[in-house]
């Protein structure tokens, strides 16, 4: 059965896939074809795999419902990237208001869309600036509150715990209510609590306000990517997501720089926390000016009804690509959290041990680390997006493979930096730069994977679920885990100075490996209980610079083991990505067909 013989209500809506595939426009728009052309199509379809869907697209495409038309549509949706869209730069999707135009290139993106993306990127930037401002002044915070490495790591951990616990709540709300209002309330909350926290004189109150900051930030991070997914499709979506995720490394780097320099100028680390709240208030008003696009708008679907939360969770758990990519992303979060929190302090201790660097200033180290982090993000995030767009045209499983490659390359580079930091500053910075660059290949790609293996009405929930898992087993525990391990090692070295050397190194690395594996398999609590107990009694104990350096060095080796584990998760993701993408396409088709039936019955009534 051909497409033209189907009932009008089940006719597939021409989607933005046609922008890159003129054959699809021509075949669906023509009244017939020659017998030779039909024969060629059938031959091509016969050679097409059962999962022959347009894997280069990060959107779900609507397809006919009967078997013959399904096979024809699979053939038509095969990419022909050397053609230009015959209808010009925009393609209007029937069934959507005329204003709903899907841009095919950067020059055709409308002002409203640019404004929305710019605001979301700005808020994401100050989000990560705020998150890592304390890392740039961590030594001053420790000295002011008289706390050890374990308590210093706990500052980030309580923030991330509240962040991940509230993410599912905002994910549920984001799939059902006004997203700009939810984000505005959240940004206002974290701006207010950050400002109030800077005035707290007791560590207990200070850490409580850091936890409240996490609640506010969860509202934004869960929802913002889904708005971008409803505005763009295909390569354009990947480009905009790459732009959005620039903010993670760039904002983190600015957090180190702004935090350290503001504290230096004001001669008080508390002023470092009073910069982002001002920007946050501006962001609240900008967020209220953006329009909330219809969910599924860019994929030719509109007014789709959300399913129950139980159904959403059940579908996500059964989605193997989503679960495995989330596990891989958890490893990315673990490494990024540990490196971002402890990197400046560790590099400072290591370089201070080099001859002639005894008077090195930590503010300068934090500044250099921030610049390197920003440069690695400016290059790594778009490089990952570019590799994805280029390779996925030929290799449908390229996205998870690129992520695995980034983690497996980053692991030895960061290990080398840990070993070289007390002897070669230039080499250390170079290894950290390339290690972070490889790690940053993941950010935009993982977000894109989620968006094309999950149907539009579940995306905010999926974002929240991914945030919950990745932070619960990733950067929620990594700063505290690294701090607790370093405290335990420092205590041992302080009691047994003669153990500092190769024997201690091998033993400590073995302990770190075991702790990293325990974290990945959800047994981290049991593995670190003894470390927490031994570290608690030594918070106020004085350690030498060598002991502090070696404690952090051995603890940070855990990140390399976790990166290898993450690479394995992404390799497994590649085994299921095509099938799960196809399932998401069919799910969107079924939901759209059901909605069309309901609309028709309503019109008849």
From Swiss-Prot:
Residues 1-94 are annotated as: Disordered. Glycans are attached at residues 149, 319, 519, 583. GO terms for molecular function: transmembrane transporter activity. It holds the Pfam family MFS_1. Its main location: membrane. Residues 76-85 have a biased composition (Basic residues). It is found in: Late endosome membrane; Lysosome membrane. SUPFAM superfamilies: MFS general substrate transporter. Keywords: Developmental protein, Differentiation, Endosome, Glycoprotein, Lipid transport, Lysosome, Membrane, Oogenesis, Transmembrane, Transmembrane helix, Transport. The keyword Membrane applies. GO terms for cellular component: late endosome membrane; lysosomal membrane; membrane; presynapse; vesicle. The chain crosses the membrane at residues 115-137, 153-173, 180-200, 203-223, 240-260, 271-291, 329-349, 367-387, 401-421, 431-451, 465-485, 558-578. InterPro entries: MFS (IPR011701), MFS_dom (IPR020846), MFS_spinster-like (IPR044770), MFS_trans_sf (IPR036259). Probable sphingolipid transporter that plays a central role in endosomes and/or lysosomes storage. Involved in TGF-beta-mediated synaptic growth regulation both pre- and postsynaptically via its function in endosomal storage regulation. Also required during oogenesis by regulating yolk spheres storage. Belongs to the major facilitator superfamily. Spinster (TC 2.A.1.49) family. This is Protein spinster.
